[in-house]
Design a protein with these regions (language model features):
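Glycine/serine-rich phosphate-binding loop and adjoining beta1-alpha1 elements at the start
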Residues: 80-263
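Adenosine-phosphate binding glycine-rich loop
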Residues: 232, 236-237, 258-262, 360-467
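Short glycine/serine/threonine-rich phosphate/pyrophosphate-binding segments
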Residues: 24, 135-136, 152-154, 194, ...
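Glycine-rich phosphate/diphosphate-binding loop of Rossmann-like nucleotide-binding domains
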Residues: 152, 159-177, 229, 235, ...
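A conserved regulatory-domain signal marking ACT and ACT-like small-molecule sensing domains
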Residues: 1-92
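Rossmann-like adenosine-cofactor binding region
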Residues: 310-379, 384-386
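General beta-strand structural signal in soluble alpha/beta enzymes
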Residues: 80-83, 183, 209-212, 233-236, ...
Length: 467
């Protein structure tokens, strides 16, 4: 099934048209016949016998964009003056900047912001180091740290190539929750180097967001940093995903009248996210969970288990089910996919209990397309923005860090994650809850602040806030 045109492959065309009837119509027809979508037209400017126009077009991929450009260039009465890839254009020069909060308009301002006045603040922090969380950027700043070993669905592409993703993460922190974040892309080859480096730079930040670090190193890095630092450390690929999955599962149960404790769940993919999803579902009361990796079902005592999978095996699959994904899916209620494309099909869904919940979150191509699950799944969710019910971490991480920073949390506990999931779930009202709307829109500006409030309260209740 071909991909649909998407904003990820959006192009901007500046064209000059013969100012006669039907030229614009022929241009629109040519773009449509090439299989692209016109998103907007504007900038109409009459220049003598020419009409100059800006056209924004969504394409399927780079080859398709080139074909659309060729189709436009081949039209009589149409001159292509200029075109560019809008995604690359957005990234030119980066997506974030450092902005001053204090104005320095005269020597009085300068004396307070810098020398000699700044020395007083330095000495206050020297005498009471906790003041660094009030009198410096630590109060509102998070490091987004990666080694570039597991970037999106691209794999180990290295730290430099990971930078656009980390910049994007920093942008989302700011846009959705007002948290200042800065990308830290580390050229390292060993998990211990990540740990040592982050410990050394930690005095600059109020929190650490680990991102796109391959498992099992991700587990080791997060555990070590949580033990070593007195600021919150959060591996978003694990816990952000887990929080939003739980929110979607709670609302799927609310929609269908089921109880989460009665569900039998299969998780395909035992990387960082899969293990974290299993952990949070256990905390939410799900009793029957079976994980599946490339070797089949994960069970206690199985060979080839790293420490994270061994923990998972010891706490799930009480019946020690064995076999392939297709075999363990039979008679279950929930499929959660965190693996790869086309892993299951409609025939697999028919072996599950009636009207299962299907969360197929592999990107860019899910384990099963929603079209194939139509009529079989009670709720279908993916990780994609072009289908309903997008399981998107941006619903979780901005609000989680906002809440943690606001109360000076030194850790992010399981209760804080559960509180975040509940806040996300409760952001969908009973009136709005449908099979195609079990999680709120990422553009619901209230969600991060509901999450922040819930996380802050949980942090206080758990006693992890700085005195």
């Amino acid at each position: 099934m071909p991909f649909l045109p998407t904003a990820a492959y959006s192009i901007h065309l500046e064209v000059a048209l013969d100012n006669i009837p039907n030229t614009l119509g022929r241009l629109a027809t040519a773009i449509g016949e090439a299989g692209a979508n016109i998103i907007s037209m504007g900038g109409f400017d009459v220049r003598g016998e020419l009409l100059v126009n800006d056209v924004v077009v969504n394409c399927r991929d780079e080859d398709h964009a080139a074909a659309v450009v060729a189709a436009v260039e081949g039209l009589s009465g149409v001159q292509l003056l200029h075109w560019h890839d809008r995604t690359f254009n957005m990234h030119e020069g980066g997506k974030i900047e450092v902005v001053s909060l204090a104005k320095v308009d005269d020597r009085h301002d300068l004396s307070m912001a810098y020398t000699p006045g700044v020395a007083r603040v330095c000495m206050a922090i020297h005498e009471n180091p906790a003041l660094s969380h009030e009198l410096t950027i630590r109060k509102n700043t998070v490091a987004v740290v990666t080694d570039g070993t597991a970037v999106l669905g691209l794999g180990d592409i290295g730290p430099a190539a990971a930078m656009p993703v980390m910049e994007g993460k920093a942008l989302l922190f700011k846009e959705f929750a007002g948290v200042d974040a800065f990308p830290i892309c580390l050229d390292v080859s060993d998990p211990q180097e990540i740990i040592d480096t982050v410990i050394r730079i930690a005095p600059t930040f109020g929190g650490i967001n680990l991102e796109d670090i391959a498992a099992p190193a991700a587990f080791e890095v997060e555990e070590a940093l949580r033990e070593a630092l007195d600021i919150p450390v959060f591996h978003d690929d694990q816990h952000g995903t887990a929080v939003v999955v739980l929110a979607a599962l709670w609302n799927s149960c609310r929609l269908t009248g089921r109880q989460i404790g009665d569900l039998s769940v299969v998780i395909a993919g035992m990387g960082a996210a899969g293990v974290a999803v299993g952990r949070i579902l256990l905390g939410a009361g799900v009793g029957s969970i079976v994980g599946v990796d490339r070797s089949g079902a994960v069970y206690s005592g199985r060979d080839n288990l790293n420490s994270a999978k061994a923990w998972f095996a010891d706490h799930t699959n009480p019946d020690r089910k064995m076999g392939t994904l297709a075999e363990v899916l039979v008679g279950t209620d929930v499929f959660i996919g965190l693996s790869g494309p086309g892993l299951i099909d409609a025939a697999n869904l028919r072996t599950m209990n009636p009207e299962p919940f299907v969360f197929a979150m592999a990107n860019p191509e899910p384990e099963i397309r929603p079209e194939e699950a139509d009529g079989l799944a009670a709720v279908m969710a993916t990780g994609r923005s072009d289908y309903p019910n997008q399981i998107n971490n941006v619903l979780a991480f901005p609000g989680i860090f906002r809440g943690a920073l606001d109360v000076g949390a030194m850790d992010i506990t399981e209760n804080m994650k559960l509180a975040a999931a509940r806040a996300i779930a409760d952001s969908v009202s009973d009136e709005d809850l449908t099979s195609t709307f079990v999680v709120p829109s990422v553009f619901d500006k209230l969600v991060p602040y509901r999450v922040a409030e819930a996380v802050a309260a949980a942090a206080v209740a758990d006693g992890v806030c700085r005195a």
